Amino acid sequence: MSSPELPSQMGVPNGHTKLQEVTPDTPLDEVFQKWEEDGGVIIKGILAPAQVTQLREELQPLLDTFQRGSTTDIEPLKRFHGSQTKRAGGLTNCSAIFRDYLLDNDFLHAIAARCFGSGGRPGVHAYWISSANTINVGPGQPAQVLHRDLGNYPHYHLLGPDGPESQATFLIATTDFTDANGATRIIPGSQKWPFNQTWNPSQSIPSEMHAGDCLLFGGKVVHGTGANTTNAERGCVAFTFCANHLTPEEAHPHIVDINIVRKLSERAQRSLGFRSQYPRGAPGLWMEGYNEVATRLGLDSK
């Protein structure tokens, strides 16, 4: 006769009541120290005010074509996506600010290379973009259920809190984030909990920040969009890198205009999946035969 299963234990936050802040000039060692302490860190001033304004203007025609809520018939997914939330993808096609200042941002790529590196070496060729979309939360949107993003990749879940990160997400605020308008909430320190531990929404804190700032977090931390109790929309671009042996959320090679891709840097092309992938120790993934897929696409002059 087997013994009864013990109930899950409630996790305990690390006691921080506000997320720590860095800037694009902060040394990576300090960025990662703060990120590893809380599971999330605010990067101040990723975009300048004029860039935020232009980004909003470039995204508005796209947002005008999207309905609020989800197109799925699956009720739990509808609630997860948010009935008053606009999630629009394909940002590379419609925004020069996204292409020039986020997709090809040296600081964001430096963070990704370190996050997905191994053996003390940066993983310059170890990641690509999982998704890039808006999460624009309208008035009256209830709080999202708290969750961990690594649920997309079950084998990473099996590795537990000591396993590597499957993804790194940058939430770039296009409006101010406040507690009242639905700032993304994080339970600080929850990325270190055993994954069978439970939590309570009251343990979460809001990632309050200004437009142009960015929230960085990984796949292991417990988080979720807050409730928008105001009369104004809370806007952001959610930009996620994942290890490039994993399937991305967004199928960029089927979405992004090849004529736009031709004008991008090799790094940006690789990040979007228009070049083959070379994680450390691999002879190549995402190939055409055993050849670089970019050559087949006419992106190389060789």
Curated annotation (Swiss-Prot):
InterPro entries recorded: Phytyl_CoA_dOase-like
Positions that bind Fe cation: 147, 149, 223
Superkingdom in the source lineage: Eukaryota
Span list, region Disordered: 1-22
Keywords: Dioxygenase, Iron, Metal-binding, Oxidoreductase
GO molecular function list: dioxygenase activity; metal ion binding
Keyword Signal carried by entry: no
Cofactor(s) in the UniProt record: Fe cation
Protein EC: 1.14.11.-
Pathway terms, separated by semicolons: Mycotoxin biosynthesis
Pfam families, alphabetized: PhyH
Function: Dioxygenase; part of the gene cluster that mediates the biosynthesis of the host-selective toxins (HSTs) AAL-toxins, sphinganine-analog mycotoxins responsible for Alternaria stem canker on tomato by the tomato pathotype. ALT1 also selectively transfers methyl groups at the first and the third cycle of chain elongation for AAL toxin.
Similarity annotation: Belongs to the PhyH family.
Note in the entry: Gene clusters encoding host-selective toxins (HSTs) are localized on conditionally dispensable chromosomes (CDCs), also called supernumerary chromosomes, where they are present in multiple copies. The CDCs are not essential for saprophytic growth but controls host-selective pathogenicity.
Subunit structure: Homodimer.
The protein's name: Dioxygenase ALT11
Organism name: Alternaria alternata
Gene for this chain: ALT11b
